[in-house]
Amino acid sequence: MDHYLEIRVLPDPEFSSEMLMAALFAKLHRVLGARGQGDIGVSFPDVNVMPGARLRLHGSAQALQALEASTWRKGLTDYCQCSPVTPVPEIKGWRVVSRVQVKSNPQRLLRRSVKKGWLTEEQAIERLATQAEQRTDLPFLNMKSLSSQQLFKLFIRHGDLLKEPVKGEFSSYGLSATATIPWF
């Protein structure tokens, strides 16, 4: 995690920055999944209500250069500006950037559990009475599942600043429940 590169989504009259960031992130997800290394993490330096127009990729110089050699942004190069792979500047701290899955529709989840054979209909009805819908105000990207083609919101949490880094692997989204990225 000693290098990074930054991609900025450029303003466009036809496409919102959220739409372009989601398209960029979907391409990143595909290439990170194909690499299967778990050595590149992401952060959104402008995160607020939405992730913002900047995406940072964190990793070793070798990992980031290998990623860039794959020309994974093909088709989006006119819509974004990318920095070269650069050493990390002075670090303010370390941060976990993770995915949060919100169970927003208990009825749908219980129907799925019955269909899969995990619960009987009676058990599902009992549980439905006790389960409440979950909501979150975390920033998100609108994504499309590659396997089912269903649309979903990928909620992203930037954890508190930590004093020490935590090693670990990153998912094909560049997110981790435990591993940290440098925050600067």
UniProtKB/Swiss-Prot annotation:
Keywords, ordered alphabetically: Antiviral defense, Endonuclease, Hydrolase, Nuclease, RNA-binding
EC number(s) given by UniProt: 3.1.-.-
Enzyme class (EC, first level): hydrolase
GO biological process, one term: defense response to virus
Nuclease among keywords: yes
UniProt-reported outcome of changing residue 29 to A: Does not complement Pseudomonas aeruginosa csy4 deletion, no production of crRNA
Domain of life: Bacteria
Molecular function via GO: endonuclease activity; RNA binding
InterPro entries with a match to the protein in the record: CRISPR-assoc_prot_Csy4 (IPR013396), CRISPR-Cas6/Csy4_sf (IPR042564)
Job description of the protein: CRISPR (clustered regularly interspaced short palindromic repeat) is an adaptive immune system that provides protection against mobile genetic elements (viruses, transposable elements and conjugative plasmids). CRISPR clusters contain sequences complementary to antecedent mobile elements and target invading nucleic acids. CRISPR clusters are transcribed and processed into CRISPR RNA (crRNA). Processes pre-crRNA into individual crRNA units.
Family to which this protein belongs: Belongs to the CRISPR-associated endoribonuclease Cas6 family. Cas6f/Csy4, subtype I-F/Ypest subfamily.
Stated name of the protein: CRISPR-associated endonuclease Cas6/Csy4
Taxonomic source organism: Escherichia coli (strain UTI89 / UPEC)
UniProt gene name: cas6f
